[in-house]
Amino acid sequence: MILAIDIGNTNICIGGLEGDRIRFAFRMVTRPHCTPDEYTAELRFLLRRFQFEKAACTGAILCSVVPALSGPLAEAVRRLTGFEPLRVAHTLDTGLTFAIDAPERLGQDRIADAAGAAALYSLPCMTVDLGTASTYNVISADRRFLGGFIVPGVQTSLRAISAGTAQLPPIAPEAPARLIGKNTEECLNSGAVYGTAAMLEGQIGRAHV
């Protein structure tokens, strides 16, 4: 079993992978100042819930968009698995080439998205990862990473509009009951959700590979 760790800006996702099967998966809130000892204790407690056994682990892989947490999480993984986690990077043998400026600065999450899409789906394709920042990646038929787009995530946009205005309240996005909102909260929610969907459709229509 491979222990996979995905460090995002909002959540840290952990999964146990056996071949194509996900044995378990859970999330932790991303906290910027945790020590290796704290992460080791928290991970050990959560992994026990899924009957994780060190002897059954054959490796680990780490993907991070929060560089300050990569070291503490990697140390926790070493302690819990006995393995040095493989770090996602553009230099890994994913079968992709990177037709972009400064591939060493490309986010590890975008590399993982592109590699997974190229392995699982026909090309060319576009990946969309809706997170704190939403990323769009374009992969050509000959397995070249061509670049993409980065935009604020749905929740990030809603937080920004609330923080930057006097009367618009903070809300959590949910499936809208209708397109045209009848009150402020509905208008914010519909704008965020349908606006994101329209942007996604528009970018797909404009990206020709």
What do these predicted ranges mean?
Residues 63-70, 190:
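Glycine-rich phosphate-binding loops at beta-strand->alpha-helix junctions
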Residues 67-79:
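N-terminal/domain-start alpha-helical segments
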Residues 207-209:
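Conserved small/polar residues in nucleotide/adenosyl-binding loops
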Residues 2-6, 61, 125-129:
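Short glycine-aspartate micro-motif
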Residues 2-45, 144-165, 169:
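Short glycine-rich, Thr/Ser-proximal phosphate-binding strand/loop in the N-terminal lobe
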Residues 54-65, 84-86:
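Short glycine-rich phosphate-binding loop at a beta-alpha junction
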Residues 162-196:
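A mobile "lid/hinge" subdomain adjacent to the ATP/sugar-phosphate binding pocket shared
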Residues 75, 83-87, 92, 96-164, ...:
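Phosphate-binding/catalytic loop of phosphoryl-transfer enzymes
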